[in-house]
Amino acid sequence: MKYQSKALIDYKFLYVVVLSLSLIGLSLLSRVSQAQDLALTELNTLYQALLNDYVSPGEKNGLTANMVNYAEIRHDDRLNDLMTRLQNYPLENLDTKQKKTAFYLNAYNILSITKVADNWPLKRLKSLGSFFKPVWTHSAGKVCGEKMTLRILERDILQQLGEPRIHFALNCAS
């Protein structure tokens, strides 16, 4: 009888240990997830701050639109910080379709804005390319450690996500 109660106590102890380790593991996974979300939140917050500072309503060719102040944004170090964050962002953190869509849309627009800012003054982003080598096929920077063109981002990544409104969210630096 003593042996049965000791065995029962051992199983209860083992159960408590396994349960405790599981809870610790879940806690650690939660912290990893929070850190991943924090990196994405910081990137998005930085991007939003730039947009708030350099995008304002304006008029061009009789049309009212939100206009980027490229003459000023090109001098802001936060644009370089954004490019670094895009380059170093871990691909494995993009674990949902929603995160991928938002991240890659922002990446496309950040790369477009940077391309214009780096070549300012410029009338159209398209003018950086030629008939045989359009700007969309030029290297635009790195995203998640991979060299990226605007065409790869749009056609090979964003369109594959199956979101029909994607084209309306791409600004092409216009």
Q: Where in this protein do the model-derived segments appear?
A:
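Bacterial N-terminal signal peptides
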Residues: Y15-S27
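Interaction/scaffold regions that mediate signaling and macromolecular assembly across diverse proteins
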Residues: Q36-L94, Q98-S174
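N-terminal secretory signal peptides that target proteins for export/translocation
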Residues: M1-Y11
